[in-house]
């Protein structure tokens, strides 16, 4: 729609004529807030030699900015306030709010305090703001004690429980527990679980890197006798069920083990270290089986109450076995942990018989259940989790057990798959008392739970609770509009995104749980607009480095135990992830850490396909509606993007010769793509399908003089498809953006709000609460997932197109915001916010009586370039709040 706007009023404490917001005196003072070390608030166990420090400003004045800053670091907070005891300081005349430590080598196991002071646009100094961080192990040699295990065979189904009593001789000032495990663990002190983490530590290539976790346990220890307990789970380390992804053949596979160091500081200045060794006792506990894909078996008759307290008699327990470290590279898990973040009670309960019940929680997600029950001793109960009901909607339909074991030619060591090894099914044996069960070392993807038993049970809604489990990334964005369908789609996208964050990005939380690289890079923008995910993705890029072969090849799932081929349009995650982090955060660290990996992988493809086109080794536009896009075209576009990102990264990092070489290669690949696939007369790529037209437009392949033609062909094609989607996951990433960027946002909006097949809305109309794996709802009967994130770009589009919050490629980290709100005809209002590295960006508009009011908040230190309705004359804005009212449509 070609609209002209009349500017009637531009207000909120400022007058804009020339495009500048004048600074206002006396309204507020500048103050540094949200201080972070390594993008975390007051983190423990930092092991980076040169940690990063960041902050943003709190200042209500329009035009607020930081002209300069001073950062100081020391070990005494009181002294630091007086500018004393400074170990390192940095003062710069700069508006940057991210810097890196450049002082003397930090000491291990030390709490450091750091402060930030800034000078504002009027050269007035702010108050000093102080935060802290603690270092952990700065090299593996600093670990004491030994890894310990129960010494059982890797196929043993028993879950080991470890315990030890120890004496602290003095009054405790502070204490830290450092624990690293090959497998999963639950740590307790004096009968209390340590921390609120779940499924720790995160999945890695265990032969290349182990993660340790740090806890403040000061309040859990005391002078005198204490007790420590550890339960070990198999996790991703020891896959016992045979599966088609060959994790049971992973080179790292072994019996789980752990190493524990507890550092205790006494009030008199002395210290002790409690370590794991053969003095720990071990026994098999009530968890009789645990597997990350399958579930847990729990026998309440085998419980030993108080096993992790001082009063327990462990005389029948055996001595733990000291084992060698599974890996020489042990690093800190410096990211947000997996946690329980939300719970739900059932929305319905169907009693099908006195031994069969069906719970519906009304929301599909990744998680676990807590089940409270009382039954006759020895009663066997199965909790079968799933996301789909059968055609009569009375029983749970779940084809995942077949999916999990399909194509498997070999049996388990003990001959056959045990009858209780059913996918996503916990199995319990009751002891006649009131029993409460919740798994420790497993999670599922589900909405429904079918409870079956071999003896009658009387159950109500109160017997079961569902918990949402995922990497607990902080919320960074919000979105709301007048269309309830779009609001539901935004929520469904977020549930799918979070359901697939478990220390690494997965495709789905129920069946595969695999780190498919393509799904992850396609959904990344959606994730980062709504959630602060930098620490999560930086960890996953370390997984990329660990999983790379000497020739630069990567597997299509990461981490991988060896399964998976090299797939060019998937493994481009190695360049897209670091580059997208740089765009969102303005932080080059991930690019620096991964440059050699990015370069090596790109060189692998350049050598394998010297002509510039990827002719095989690709998956293409996965699961399209009907039209199958040319895979050589789509894969070659991602090949171009790989090379282009390496070129841009080389330029940023000052590698001139690399920059020139890869820039030349990128242009050569682009030219080759256009020569083979573009008809310049018609503006059609390949067959002219939606994906084949939108991908070249979105990824910058189309020659400047052909953009209009290609855009016209795209909108024509979409019109022929009745404004419906005809794409797979690659086209899903680009179709809405390409339409919007070429002036066809109304058509994109119509596509988004369709509710018949194929569409996002159709999934919700069919009862979905997350995004699906297949456009065809009926295809779910073939085992397709109802909780996949690969079609999730729509979530980012809400922010970019409707609210208009966009990255400026020339100024990363939202230093300058490209504001392109589109006032689509069928919406009455849009409200969105995004917490950028500079602070909160707010963009909202309302339509009243045919006129639009638009309001934007630009955080201190940032600027914006505004295009009303996504086009027209650019308006330059500085920080503050700006309102446009009475924008009229002709």
Where are the language model's segments positioned?
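Active-site-proximal structural scaffolding
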Residues: 48, 126, 159, 180, ...
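Non-catalytic C-terminal accessory modules of carbohydrate-active enzymes
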Residues: 250-263, 271-306, 311, 331-342, ...
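Extracellular/oxidizing-compartment recognition motifs
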Residues: 26-510, 518-519, 535-538, 554-560, ...
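C-terminal capping/lid segments that line or modulate ligand- or cofactor-binding pockets
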Residues: 228, 298-299, 512, 530, ...
